[in-house]
Amino acid sequence: MKLHNLRPAKGGEVKARKRVGRGYGSGLGHNAGRGRDGQNSRSGGGVRPGFEGGQMPLFRRLPKRGFKNHFAKQYAEINIRDLNCFEDGEEITPEILANAGFFKPAKAKDGVKILGDGEITKKLTIKANKFTKSAEEKITKAGGKVEVI
């Protein structure tokens, strides 16, 4: 095969842009695919998104729900079953957890919270901003220490 034998892949050819409003002979003259007169035939014409022709639109027919709490605390939540990958007797801080890829620092604006799902088999010293009661119990039962920072 040589360069002069190469052909574009089937369906991969670049189609020419439709040039509308360029005379009757082109097949796309006169109304240029916009139909007859009206708001949509004009330059910049058309109705806003959600407009239903004057009928009460769906977004106004449905009630508002809830609110966003701008003061909500945002913790990175980590289960104790995930901490078994660390060595016995190791001290674990939020920085170590972030470097190990447990969470992205941007997602943990208010720190790290340790949750009690799963079991822990290593004696670890864990420093975090919050602990659930079950997590605290399981860590101390395994011989580890809990430090709130």
Curated annotation (Swiss-Prot):
GO molecular function term, any single one: rRNA binding
Cross-referenced PANTHER family: 50S RIBOSOMAL PROTEIN L15 (PTHR12934), LARGE RIBOSOMAL SUBUNIT PROTEIN UL15M (PTHR12934:SF11)
Role noted for this protein: Binds to the 23S rRNA.
Residue stretches of biased makeup (Gly residues): 22-32, 43-53
Taxonomy, superkingdom: Bacteria
Keywords: Ribonucleoprotein, Ribosomal protein, RNA-binding, rRNA-binding
GO biological process terms on file: translation
Keyword Nucleus attached: no
HAMAP family associated with the record: Ribosomal_uL15
Residues covered by region (Disordered): 1-58
Encoding gene, per UniProt annotation: rplO
Pfam families recorded: Ribosomal_L27A
Organism (species): Finegoldia magna (strain ATCC 29328 / DSM 20472 / WAL 2508) (Peptostreptococcus magnus)
Any Gene Ontology CC annotation: cytosolic large ribosomal subunit
UniProt name for this protein: Large ribosomal subunit protein uL15
Assigned protein family: Belongs to the universal ribosomal protein uL15 family.
Subunit structure: Part of the 50S ribosomal subunit.
Transferase in keyword set: no
InterPro entries in the record: Ribosomal_uL15, Ribosomal_uL15/eL18, Ribosomal_uL15/eL18_sf, Ribosomal_uL15_bac-type, Ribosomal_uL15_CS
